[in-house]
Amino acid sequence: EISGQEWRQTVDVNLNGQFYCASQAVPLLKQSLNASIVCISSVAGRLGYAYRTPYAATKWAIIGLAKSLAIELGPSGIRVNALLPGIVEGPRIEKVISDRAQTLGITYDEMEQEYINKVSLRRMVNAQDVANQALFLCSPTGMNISGQSISICGNVEVL
């Protein structure tokens, strides 16, 4: 069950935070010759995520935000894209795996393997993979990429 407070907090952090950040940056970006906004979404926005409805809903909304901003800001020379990380190594996914394993009554290692088995490449993404893609999109090499939602997930098909 999802409380109204949980819903509002997730929307405020995940969606509104990116909107307000972008809106504050736009006046400065309009003065740049290489302006780019990279929104961070998630593959959960495209696939859905059981028991994480507020999270998945806001990540889907970020995809729409990025696409709409790309259309609106393109004439000013500002590129906008969304990155959709999959299962990213680190403390956050470790907690998700641990909590889920406890709920299901299985070991952490068994639950982690279930997550990894959902990825075609059979490995998690690391934060540097996401950072590298963001740097590419912000670089001159990414000058003609806008309005795109780019998955960095090793081909996750279900969460």
Tell where the protein language model's regions lie, with residue ranges.
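Residue(s) in the substrate-gating loop at a strand-loop-helix junction
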Residues: 42
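Short, small/polar-rich loop/turn modules that mediate ligand/substrate recognition or access, typified
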Residues: 74, 79, 145-147
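Alpha-helical segment proximal to the catalytic Tyr-Lys
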Residues: 27, 71-72, 143
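Active-site helix of classical SDR
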Residues: 22, 58, 66
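Active-site loop-to-helix junction immediately N-terminal to the catalytic Tyr of the SDR YXXXK motif
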Residues: 2, 48-56, 68, 96
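Short C-terminal tail/terminal secondary-structure segment
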Residues: 46-47, 123, 134-135, 146-159
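Substrate-binding pocket helix/loop in short-chain dehydrogenase/reductase
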Residues: 3-11, 115-116
